Regions:
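Short consensus segments that form the blades of beta-propeller domains
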Residues: 77-80, 156-162, 196-198
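Extended catalytic-interface subdomain
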Residues: 1-83, 87-92, 96, 100-101
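Active-site neighborhoods of metal-dependent hydrolases
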Residues: 85, 100, 152-156, 162-167
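Residue-level marker for isolated small/hydroxyl-bearing positions within beta-strands
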Residues: 101-103, 161-162, 218, 258-259
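Substrate-gating cap/lid region and adjacent catalytic-acid/histidine neighborhood
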Residues: 92, 96-98, 106, 116-119
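Conserved beta-strand position repeated once per blade in WD40 beta-propeller domains
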Residues: 88, 206, 246-247
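Extracytoplasmic/lumenal domain signature
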Residues: 1-19, 63, 69-72, 109-152, ...
Length: 270
């Protein structure tokens, strides 16, 4: 158990709402992803879309973790599609190591007064990019509807956050230190050539660990199942697709099998 400290967080909620002055932060482990989108550190394949991302990051409320939703629009980073997400972590109890896959993705949210909520999204959005990559949520019975982005995207549909967009991290639960952190996946099956060079792709499913010290994870948008040494980063690839958390099936025989979406049963040695 590591100490928790209260830190000041951004203030200024919309009318009718409130935020607390402080939030609890653990002293360890260190954050798995970045928590602030620096306008000087945005990403783009071209100067045009990078410039768009920079200006948008400057125009929105963008004060890091716990930036309140606002009428002018706020950056959420990590977002509902970022950080340690749907797949969840895995724990190697014999080695006291936690393995977590994460997404380094931001999103935006705009609070719209109820009087304007009958308008179309294209009329409420700041531009066509926000309209393409957002949804209008009505939030019936509240003073606001919201324009919630699926991701903070450039005009080319590329995340404004710098790669890696996906990572895998091992944490020593005794010390709270990161043992290793590596980009997870590539853009090979996500983007056209020549943009396969990006390391660290969006990912969904979580990792699975074995008692023998192996970590297996599919999860990524490229078609590989990856195997790692849990204690220190050594990897290998199996060419197959799977976006869900890999299952480990141990029948009465001595064999063990990996199973999951897109996977045949793969025999492994524990």
């Amino acid at each position: 158990i590591f100490p928790i400290e209260e830190r000041d967080v951004p203030q200024g909620a919309v009318e009718g709402d409130y935020v607390t002055k402080t939030q609890p932060f653990p002293s360890k482990p260190a954050p798995l992803t970045k928590t602030y989108l620096d306008p000087e550190d945005v990403f783009g394949f071209t100067p045009w879309d990078k410039g768009y991302c920079k200006k948008a990051a400057e125009d929105y409320r963008n004060e890091g973790l716990y930036t309140p939703p606002s009428i002018e629009g706020s950056v959420h980073y990590p977002s509902a599609i970022g950080g340690a997400n749907w797949g969840g972590p895995a724990i190697d109890a014999s080695r006291n190591i936690l393995i977590a896959n994460t997404m380094n993705l931001a999103s935006t949210i705009v609070m719209v007064p109820r009087s304007d909520c009958d308008k179309a999204l294209k009329d409420l959005a700041r531009d066509s990019v926000q309209s393409r990559f957002s949804a209008l949520q009505q939030n019936e019975g509240t003073p606001y509807c919201t324009i919630r982005a699926f991701g903070f995207m450039s005009p080319l549909g590329v995340p404004c956050t710098k790669p890696p967009w996906g990572s895998l991290t091992a944490i020593d639960l005794d010390t709270g230190d990161h043992l290793w952190q590596i980009p997870l996946g590539t853009s090979k099956d996500l983007a056209p050539f020549p943009f396969w060079w990006i390391k660290g792709a969006p990912n969904i499913g979580g990792p699975t660990v074995t008692a023998s010290g192996l970590t297996f994870i599919a999860a990524t948008s490229d078609y590989y199942l990856r195997a790692f040494n849990t204690s220190f980063f050594v990897s290998s690839l199996i060419s197959t697709k799977g976006n869900l958390t890999v299952g480990l099936h141990i029948p009465k025989s001595d064999a063990a099998y990996l199973t999951g979406e897109g996977l045949l049963a793969i025999n492994i040695a524990l």
